[in-house]
Amino acid sequence: MSSANTKIYDQNSNEFSTLPEIKFAHEQYLDSKNNKLNQCSINNSIVGALDLRYGKKLTPVIEKGLEISNGKLKGIRMLLAAHNDERISSGAVKTKTGIMLDPNFIEGAKILEKNKLSLDFWIYHTQLNELEFGAKTLPDLSIILNHIGGPIQVGPYEGKQ
């Protein structure tokens, strides 16, 4: 079974295909809460994975995610690290540059903003201009940048600081 983050890029997936991960995370929360031997609670907050390029079609998906998580869904993560140089790879997830500039992506992000959900993603330092565009377009959206904007030190950046 692939993770929700890789399912996003599966051509056979649809906008609802990653909801089982949110459901599973919430079930783990309930299990930990009901386990008297366990002294800690897990998954009090859940960050799921969705492809924001579905745009306006994500409204019922987000609503369902909030429902099945009993409000524990706090944000969405999308792996967007991409570079045009084939020597630079982000691992199992193959994506392309420019996704954050796509009008459908922006529409999907607006749904997050409306529902007070954060947008959490990993990009390379070469994509920070896309992040800036999104931040200026959606000033009330909470954006979480992972891995400090992914400084690249291979390919054309090898040996550069």
Language-model features: locations:
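Acidic-and-aromatic substrate-binding clefts and catalytic sites of carbohydrate-active enzymes
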Residues: 14-18, 50-58, 122-129, 153
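Hydrophobic faces of well-ordered beta-strands that scaffold small-molecule active sites
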Residues: 1-2, 44-48, 74-78, 119-121, ...
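Glycine-rich phosphate-binding "P-loop"
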Residues: 9-13, 78-99
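Active-site environment of divalent metal-dependent phosphoester hydrolases
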Residues: 5-8, 53-54, 82-85, 126-129, ...
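Acidic (Asp/Glu)-rich catalytic clusters
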Residues: 24-41, 60-76, 102-103, 107-114, ...
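The substrate-binding groove and active-site-proximal loops of carbohydrate-active enzymes
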Residues: 8-16, 44-52, 95-97, 118
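An N-terminally biased module of ancient metal coordination in phosphate/nucleic-acid-related enzymes
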Residues: 1-39
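Catalytic pocket-lining loop regions of alpha/beta-barrel enzymes
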Residues: 95-161
